[in-house]
Amino acid sequence: MDYKTAGVDVTAGRAFVERIKSCVEKTHKSEVIGGLGGFGGCIRIPKGFESPVLVSGTDGVGTKLELAQQYGCHFGVGIDLVAMCVNDVITNGARPLFFLDYIASGTLTPDALAEVIEGIAAGCCQSDCSLLGGETAEMPGFYPIGRYDLAGFCVGIVENHHLIDGTKINCGDQIIGIKSNGVHSNGFSLVRKVLSMANVDENTLFGKDKRNLIQSLLEPTAIYVQLVEKLLRENLPIHGMTHITGGGLPENLPRIFPSGLSPHIDITTWEITEIFNWLQNAGDIPEIDLWNTFNMGIGFCLIVPKNEVNSALEICIKNDFEAWNIGQVVESQNNSKNIGIFGIPS
C-alpha cells in the first residue's frame, strides 16, 4: 500500500504545479519577490504610500460550482472566485494587491483544474492583482471523484486618509447602481432547484448576444476594480460602496450605513435583467424572495453627493458599465438601517 494507492498522486500534483506556473507568473507585478513554489508568497508594499492600510477579503463561489462542473465550464468559476473577493476589497477604496487560491478535490483532474487556474489568473489580470500563491489539495474519500471546491483570499491596499468606510454618508446622498452580468455567484441553490423542476428549456435564449440558459447562468461575475480605480482617480467624492452579493440589495446596501440613515431605492429606475424574470416565472418565486436572494441586475453600488451624480454616471458609461441613479439616502426611523424599496408589488 502506498499514498498513490490511497488516492493521492504526489507526482501528478508536482506536474500540475509546473503546468500552471507560466499562467500564474504572468499575473506577477514588479512588487512580487520570488516565484511560485515556495512556502510563502512574498510581495513588497508598493512605493508612494505614506500610511498604508491593508484590506482583506475571502470568499468562495458557492453552489454555482455544482452547475459549472455539471456542464464542464471551469474557466468562468475561476474568474468568479477572484471577483467575489476583489469586489469586496475595493468597497473600502483599496486596490487589490495580491490573491491566493485554495482548490480541494476528490482526485486531481489536471485539465479541469488548469482551466480553473487560468480563469483565476484572468480575473487577477482584470483586477491588476498578483496571483501570489495557492494550495491544491487532493482529498480522496472526502470529495466525490471529479468534484472540487474553491476558496479565495485577497489583500488590497489604500492610504489611511483615503479609506472609504461609510462614515461620510449623508442624508440626501444618491445611490448609483452599476449593472451586474447576471446572477453572478449567489443564489445558486435556488437556481439549481428551479432547474431541477420539469419543463425547463435549456435552449431559452437571453440578452443581445442570445446566450442559452446555462451560458447565461454561468456568466462570470463582473469585476468592478478598474472602474472604481478610474472613479477614484477622477477624485469623485465617494461616500460609500457596496458589492451586491448574497441577500441582494436589502441585505448588502444597508451594511455600510451610519446609524440614523437608510437607503431608499426605486426599482423602476432600471430594467431588471431578464434572467431574473425567467427564474421567477419558472420557479414561481415570490417577489420578496427574489429581491432577498439575487442582485436583480445591480452588482455594485456607489453612494455620492447629489451634485456628483452626473459625473459618476458619465465615468461609468465611458468605461462601458451601465449605471443608474437608483435611490437616495434618507433619515431612518428608530435608528433602523433597513432599506426602503419602491416598486415591488405587494
Curated annotation (Swiss-Prot):
Which pathway, per its entry?
Purine metabolism; IMP biosynthesis via de novo pathway; 5-amino-1-(5-phospho-D-ribosyl)imidazole from N(2)-formyl-N(1)-(5-phospho-D-ribosyl)glycinamide: step 2/2
Q: Which GO terms describe its biological process?
A: 'de novo' IMP biosynthetic process; adenine biosynthetic process
Q: Sorted alphabetically, which SUPFAM superfamilies does this protein's record hold?
A: PurM C-terminal domain-like, PurM N-terminal domain-like
- Which EC number(s) are documented for this chain? 6.3.3.1
Key word ATP-binding present in the record?
yes
- List membrane-spanning regions: none
CDD domains the UniProt entry points to: PurM
Keyword Magnesium attached: no
Q: Which domain of life is it from?
A: Bacteria
Q: Report keywords, A-Z.
A: ATP-binding, Cytoplasm, Ligase, Nucleotide-binding, Purine biosynthesis
Q: State the Gene Ontology terms under molecular function.
A: ATP binding; phosphoribosylamine-glycine ligase activity; phosphoribosylformylglycinamidine cyclo-ligase activity
One Pfam family hit? AIRS_C
Report the catalytic activity. 2-formamido-N(1)-(5-O-phospho-beta-D-ribosyl)acetamidine + ATP = 5-amino-1-(5-phospho-beta-D-ribosyl)imidazole + ADP + phosphate + H(+)
Q: Name one GO cellular component term.
A: cytosol
Q: Where does it live in the cell?
A: Cytoplasm
The Swiss-Prot or TrEMBL record describes its family as follows: Belongs to the AIR synthase family.
Q: Which NCBIfam families match?
A: purM
This protein is called: Phosphoribosylformylglycinamidine cyclo-ligase
**What species was this sequence derived from?**
Prochlorococcus marinus (strain NATL2A)
